[in-house]
UniProtKB/Swiss-Prot annotation:
Residues 221-523 are annotated as: Catalytic. This is Threonine--tRNA ligase. Pfam families: HGTP_anticodon, tRNA-synt_2b, tRNA_SAD. GO terms for molecular function: ATP binding; metal ion binding; threonine-tRNA ligase activity; tRNA binding. It comes from Gloeobacter violaceus (strain ATCC 29082 / PCC 7421). Its cofactor is Zn(2+). The lineage of its organism: Bacteria, Bacillati, Cyanobacteriota, Cyanophyceae, Gloeobacterales. The keyword Protein biosynthesis applies. GO terms for cellular component: cytoplasm.
Length: 627
């Protein structure tokens, strides 16, 4: 399965160029109507942000005339502009720039578009001494008109669009956020620039709400909580983008894997295991080597004989391996569908600057499965996969705030393989299933994998951020490239259709999302440490251990805090570690065979003192409900 790591994560941004169907898409759903950050016209907000980036550059060149300008686009949640300046921007500089931007905005200056003859534009840029703009200009289509936008006595080479006047930009609805390094045109061999990031909104209230959510997002950052909860670490010696899972983190992974593995067995999946490397020929046959090579690690153990390229590569995907398992014997139509599943680790050669915590890594595990079905089985099996994914989301308390993105081919692009007919059949199958299931979906052209269209579930977390989670893909093309067959009822050899699916997607990224969604407060069934028993003094450690043994015998994850800390400190430590249930035991509890139950369930009072078996019944009830 082609699984794209980058998480669609935004506190506000809508999906661009959407085609909404069946009651709308996620950004127009009832759940979003009262979201202050979603009350803006996205096109208007884009113009405001783009124009604010121009105001930023105008202010910078007024305050620091030696600065050269490069590019300044609108981005999700704001804008940035890259500058070439001999000295670094300081926090004090940002305050001065922001003040100057407000002064400019309050002048209510028009932003006027002008078309300029090519030669005249070249002369202007040369006279200004703006080498970066000149380089951009020289790369423009010679037949296309060249335009600039003028604001007062300052102008920028730009195609737009922009607001008509700075009066449309509220002086208290934007803020400069930070300065970061950037290379000209993203090339490490080119000049290093300074990038100033900012955010802009229609109203001060929206800005305030955005900043509030960003502060909350910092508290929930999975990198911060991952360290505090002892789930994973990184090592410079191991390398960037390669997380190391600690015992608690590994246990969390195991819990998720076992949960899905057991459910898959109920639904007819068979577990397989495949190697981490393979001959490059495997990926040449699949097409990955030609369409995905830049994202793969380089060849290992290479040899060249008469110009032939040979060697091994670390796998970027699991599907070609599952195909080889299917192909190892001839199958009858009676055996189909065949559902092969694996928690397979794959490797992508991400650039170091693109790595980020668990959301963008170089080695990650995908809950990959590939179904080999007859054309007649495709619709039913696709719907069953969607049902499995929805079951997973419900079980993990992710709610119903999902929309479906139908990631289809851009027919004008050459990045895809396979025939038009194969693509049309696959896209039609996904569209029909989505309509039959009543999914709220939108079509995103150009988002398909290079060998097939897919349905991506888009999830909105507790902060209103959007993430891509589970994926289902229909594939007529790889069965053709690998010449897969089954024996039909009439004895003829026919091609199966493949369904690729991954409810979690990248397990690493999925865990990052869970950490941030729950702010580290995992549901009881999912928490690596479910219960911590706190003896009041050393005298009651033995009783605490006996309670732990009883819980462990019932396959609950329990620990005893046998430290010499006072009880208040033990309770605080348990709360900081976000252990769902704390059991306090002292003389009274030891004598009566009870425990004092403290719970972290929001809105639920502590259960008070209960007999051990009643406390166990309470825990088992919550575990059964996955709360």
């Amino acid at each position: 399965m082609t699984f794209r790591q980058p998480a669609r994560r935004t506190l506000s941004g809508r999906f661009g160029a959407l085609k909404c169907h069946n009651g709308g898409c996620s950004c127009d759903s009832k759940a979003m109507e009262n979201d202050i950050l979603r009350q803006s016209d996205p096109e208007k907000l884009h113009r405001i942000r783009h124009s604010t980036s121009h105001i930023l550059a105008m202010a910078v060149q007024k305050l620091f005339p030696e600065t050269k300008v490069t590019i300044g686009p609108a981005i999700e949640n704001g804008f940035y502009y890259d500058f070439d300046r001999p000295t670094p921007f300081t926090p004090e500089d940002l305050k001065k720039i922001e003040k100057e931007m407000r002064r400019i905005v309050q002048q209510k200056l028009p932003l006027v578009r002008e078309e300029v003859p090519r030669e005249a534009m070249r002369e202007r840029l040369e006279a200004l001494g703006e080498p970066y703009k000149l380089e951009l200009f020289e790369g423009f289509d010679h037949d296309a008109p060249v335009s600039l936008y003028r604001t007062g006595d300052w102008w920028d080479l730009c195609a737009g669009p922009h607001v008509e006047s700075t009066a449309e930009i509220h002086p208290n609805a934007f803020k400069l956020r930070s300065v970061a390094g950037a290379y000209w045109r993203g090339d490490e061999k080119r000049a290093q620039l300074q990038r100033i990031y900012g955010t802009a909104w229609e109203t001060p209230e929206q800005l305030e709400e955005f900043l509030r959510r960003e502060e909350e997002a910092k508290k929930r950052d999975h990198r911060k909580l991952g360290r505090e909860l002892g789930l994973f670490v990184f090592s410079d010696l191991v390398g960037p983008g390669l997380p190391l899972w600690t015992p608690k983190g590994a246990l969390l992974r195991y819990i998720l894997e076992e949960f899905l593995r057991k459910e898959q067995v109920k639904r007819g999946y068979q577990q397989v295991v495949t190697p981490h490397i393979a001959r490059v020929d495997l990926f040449k046959t699949s097409g990955h080597w030609f369409k995905y090579k830049d994202d793969m690690f380089p060849l290992m153990a290479t040899s060249e004989e008469e110009g032939a390229e040979e060697g091994f590569v670390m796998k970027p995907m699991n599907c070609p391996f599952h195909i080889q398992i299917y192909k190892s014997e001839l199958h009858s139509y009676r055996e189909l569908p065949i559902r092969l599943a694996e928690f397979g680790t794959v490797y992508r050669y991400e650039q170091s600057g693109e790595l980020g915590g668990l959301t963008r890594v170089r080695g990650f595990t995908v809950d990959d499965s590939h179904l080999f079905v007859t054309p007649e089985q495709l619709d039913d099996e696709f719907k069953k996969v969607v049902d499995l994914i929805q079951f997973v989301f419900r079980s993990l308390q992710l709610g119903d705030g999902f929309s479906a993105r139908l990631s289809f081919r851009d027919p004008t692009s050459d990045k895809y393989i396979g025939s038009d007919a194969a693509w049309e059949k696959a896209q039609a199958a996904i569209l029909k299933a989505s309509q039959d299931l009543g999914l709220k979906y939108f079509v995103a052209e150009g988002e398909a994998a290079f060998y097939g269209p897919k349905l991506d579930f888009i999830f909105r977390d507790a902060l209103g951020r959007e993430w891509q989670l589970g994926t289902v893909q229909v594939d007529y093309i790889l069965p053709e490239r690998f010449e897969l067959e089954y024996v039909a009822e009439d004895g003829s050899r026919r091609r199966p259709v493949m369904i690729h699916r991954a409810p979690f997607g990248s397990l690493e990224r999925f865990i990052a999302i869970l950490i941030e969604h729950f702010a580290g407060d995992f549901p009881l069934w999912l928490a690596p440490e479910q219960v911590r028993i706190l003896p009041v003094t050393d005298q009651f450690v033995g009783y605490a251990e006996s309670v732990k043994d009883r819980l462990v015998s019932l396959e609950m994850r329990a620990e005893v805090d046998a430290s010499s800390e006072r009880l208040g400190k033990k309770i605080r430590n348990g709360e900081t570690a976000k252990v769902p249930v704390l059991l306090v035991v002292g003389e009274s509890e030891a004598n009566s065979g009870t425990v004092a139950v403290r719970t972290r369930v929001e809105g639920e009072k502590d259960k008070g003192t209960l007999p051990v078996e009643e406390a166990i019944a309470y825990l088992q009830e919550r575990l059964a409900k996955r709360t």
